[in-house]
Amino acid sequence: MARDEVRRMLPADIKREVLIKDENAETNPKWGFPPYERPIELHIQYGVINLDKPPGPTSHEVVAWIKRILNLEKAGHGGTLDPKVSGVLPVALEKATRVVQALLPAGKEYVALMHLHGDVPENKIIDVMKEFEGEIIQRPPLRSAVKRRLRTRKVYYIEILEIDGRDVLFKVGVEAGTYIRSLIHHIGLALGVGAHMAELRRTRSGPFKEDETLVTLHDLVDYYHFWKEDGIEKYLRRAIQPMEKAVEHLPKIWIKDSAVAAVAHGANLTVPGIVKLNVGIKRGDLVAIMTLKDELVALGKAMMTSQEMMQRSKGIAVDVEKVFMPRDWYPKLW
């Protein structure tokens, strides 16, 4: 992989090797539901939509519309977009609502149009913008809903797409909670002419991208109608991703069938239940606990490193924080 490609990665792009702890473990096909094989009702209940938010409404309004369109009681979005901003807005449905927490460490990508308030040579624009890659200090904008404390955020990459006079179109990958409006303001100050954000679109939120999974509100209306009125579920099934999509980027631990029900009932994960795990897990990391069918069981905080989980035969490996697996999908085997 070229250096430039490595540099243009979000945390969600990290490829993780797998360590096998128990080579003989198998899963019973009678139990559970592989993510892409759930009945459509369960697919919705445990689903996430990669929504293309239109400019205009608030993120909260868009979620309320989705609840009405799909006749849902609960839904939640992963990372607020300002009303004028369009693009990728992951919306988790019903039983999957709390999975949006998993998107926080994943990073986000935007395409922004910056308008400079004076003329600047292209080479200076390129050089100055490159300096904003890495750690930056920001204070949330006045219009922000959070307290205006100074905080550090990471800019993973900035890629200039086009410069047309005083207009600069660029792509930027950032840590969650980074304000692009503030970033542009500070780039303008560094260039000595000032600048403002003319337009903004989010193109990625962790594993959710501008790809074939991206759907509009109009799409959802049509697809729900096809299912309810005509019994055609394939379009709605394509528009709603399994909740497991939202944890693609997290370090994972796969567990035995015999351990699933215990974790689903809220028990912490102990070492004897582990079949395999990702390399590089550190104490305190947010991890996803998975079945051998790649179903999400729970999210939790690692209490051991990958190495410790491999070497030890007992002890608590993960402090379970959020359970997603229903208690009755796997039998009690303890």
UniProtKB/Swiss-Prot annotation:
PROSITE patterns: PUA (PS50890)
Reaction(s) the record says it catalyses: uridine(55) in tRNA = pseudouridine(55) in tRNA
The family this protein is said to belong to: Belongs to the pseudouridine synthase TruB family. Type 2 subfamily.
E.C. code: 5.4.99.25
Function noted in UniProt: Could be responsible for synthesis of pseudouridine from uracil-55 in the psi GC loop of transfer RNAs.
Keywords: Isomerase, tRNA processing
Example GO BP: snRNA pseudouridine synthesis
Record-annotated PUA domain positions: 250-325
UniProt-listed PANTHER family: CENTROMERE/MICROTUBULE BINDING PROTEIN CBF5, H_ACA RIBONUCLEOPROTEIN COMPLEX SUBUNIT DKC1
Organism: Pyrococcus horikoshii (strain ATCC 700860 / DSM 12428 / JCM 9974 / NBRC 100139 / OT-3)
One Pfam family in the UniProt entry: DKCLD
Gene: truB
Xref: NCBIfam families: CBF5, PRK04270.1, unchar_dom_2
GO molecular function, one term: RNA binding
Active site residues of this protein: D82 (nucleophile)
Higher taxonomy: Archaea, Methanobacteriati, Methanobacteriota, Thermococci, Thermococcales
SMART domains documented for this protein: DKCLD, PUA
Protein name, entry field: Probable tRNA pseudouridine synthase B
